[in-house]
């Protein structure tokens, strides 16, 4: 998979779990928000049914994980408005698993065994307990968000960032070890001259484990690393902010939820502490950060984000413009764009089959497993599935980078196809 994205995705799951512990139970959207939209029979044949599993009403809140689903649905709506897939409408069946393993298994059963979907698209599941069932059924799962190691474990599952792992259904990755690269840290050292970085975590096992992974990557790139840890129940963020100032930190990373990040930034604001960059991940690459960090403008304007897809505010790109037009006036996020790309990926695969011997799951998977990388019209950095027997020691990897600017939103920093470096791959156990 794209180096560092597996680790970052695990971090997204970690932050979701931490937020679950903080809020106890999350907001729930009305069930009608997740009903399957009615679809008329097309003139070109029976509808082609696809499924989308999302942890929509999980304890992390109703909007936290719905971006990929919303982006995929927008793509299929636009496709159907143009006549569908060679005359066949795409009928989208959604299922909310509630963020639990039991709910996920129920969604897999409903979509595959009862609704007989041809494929799954843009899965975003906190607990992908049903992954073995999807693999056993031979149903392709295309463009899912790798919040668990399932996309580096099972056949027939194709995560949005690709994978190099064997994916035979045994242990994740290579014997239970996954690998991530150091390209994020390399970029900030090369482009911003950063040499001192802090990693803030809770004194909680999962948070501390991810913080160690980040610290190891920073040290591998020669950074001086300042490890900061706060009490999970009674965090003293003012003390952390003061230490960041005293240690002259350039970059700030974290293994905390959004609530903790905002409180840290407010403490930094109160003490007048500034860093060159507060680096976050694709899950927070959205327009909501202006609201989240409203009381910490200094922190807001030092927010940087990295990922493997083109900035959803890059209106100079025609594929981004098409995405934005389809989304209308809705608040936008990077996960929506990646859901849109996942739906495009399925459509391109299916269309290649219709142009040949016919549409089958096997043919769709042949398209996904091609040696040629997939880019979704340039929305994604090149994605491929390699099935390497051994993990790579180094990899040439590119990076999409943006920073927040008041009045402009997320502003891209160079072309993602040129923000590249050959970096070491570091092992970690999910």
Please report, for each region that a protein language model flagged, where it lies by residue:
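Bacterial signal peptide processing site
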Residues: 26-29
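Extracytoplasmic "Venus flytrap"
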Residues: 33-73, 97-102, 202-208, 332-337
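Extracytoplasmic ligand/sensor domains, especially the bilobed periplasmic-binding protein
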Residues: 117-229, 278-297
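Beta-alpha junction/loop-to-helix N-cap segments that form part of ligand/metal-binding clefts
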Residues: 34-36, 63-67, 83-155, 231-235
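Segments of small-molecule ligand-sensing domains
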Residues: 327-336, 347-411
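Periplasmic-binding protein-like
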Residues: 111-124, 142-145, 197-201, 248-264, ...
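C-terminal motif of bacterial Sec signal peptides marking the signal peptidase cleavage site
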Residues: 21-24
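Extracellular/periplasmic periplasmic-binding protein-like sensory domains
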Residues: 162-165, 267-343, 416-419, 424-429
């Amino acid at each position: 998979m794209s180096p560092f994205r597996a680790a970052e995705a695990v971090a997204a799951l970690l932050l979701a779990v931490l937020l679950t512990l903080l809020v106890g139970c999350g907001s729930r959207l009305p069930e009608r928000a997740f009903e399957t939209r009615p679809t008329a029979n097309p003139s070109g044949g029976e509808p082609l049914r696809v499924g989308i599993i999302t942890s929509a009403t999980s304890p992390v809140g109703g909007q936290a994980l719905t971006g990929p689903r919303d982006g995929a649905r927008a793509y299929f709506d636009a496709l159907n408005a143009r006549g569908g897939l060679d005359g066949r409408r795409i009928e989208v069946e959604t299922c909310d698993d509630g963020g639990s393993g039991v709910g996920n298994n129920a969604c897999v059963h409903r979509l595959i065994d009862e609704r007989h979907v041809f494929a799954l698209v843009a899965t975003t599941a906190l607990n992908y307990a049903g992954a073995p069932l999807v693999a056993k059924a031979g149903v392709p799962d295309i463009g899912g968000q790798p919040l668990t190691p399932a996309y580096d474990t099972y056949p027939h599952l194709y995560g949005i960032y690709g994978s190099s792992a064997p994916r035979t259904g045994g242990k994740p990755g290579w014997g239970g070890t996954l690998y991530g690269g150091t390209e994020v840290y390399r970029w900030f050292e090369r482009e911003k001259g950063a040499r001192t970085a802090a990693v803030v975590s809770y004194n909680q096992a999962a948070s501390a484990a991810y913080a160690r992974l980040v610290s190891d990557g920073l040290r591998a790139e020669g950074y001086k690393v300042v490890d900061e840890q706060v009490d999970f129940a009674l965090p003293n963020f003012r003390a952390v902010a003061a230490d960041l100032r005293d240690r002259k930190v350039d970059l700030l990373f974290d293994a905390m939820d959004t609530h903790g990040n905002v409180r840290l930034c407010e403490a930094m604001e109160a003490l007048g502490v500034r860093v060159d960059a507060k680096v976050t991940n694709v899950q927070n690459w959205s327009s909501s950060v202006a609201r989240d960090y409203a009381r910490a403008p200094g922190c807001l304007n030092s927010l940087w984000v990295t990922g493997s897809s083109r900035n959803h505010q890059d209106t100079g790109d025609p594929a981004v413009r098409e995405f934005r037009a389809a989304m209308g006036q809705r608040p936008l996020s990077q996960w929506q764009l990646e859901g849109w790309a996942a739906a495009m990926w399925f459509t391109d695969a299916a269309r290649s089959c219709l142009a040949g011997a016919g549409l089958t799951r096997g043919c769709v998977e042949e398209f996904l497993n091609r040696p040629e990388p997939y880019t979704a019209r340039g929305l994604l950095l090149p994605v491929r599935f390699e099935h390497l027997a051994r993990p790579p020691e180094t990899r040439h990897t590119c990076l999409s980078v943006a920073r927040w600017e008041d009045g402009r939103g997320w502003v891209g920093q160079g072309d993602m196809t040129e923000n590249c470096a050959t970096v070491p791959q570091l092992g970690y156990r999910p």
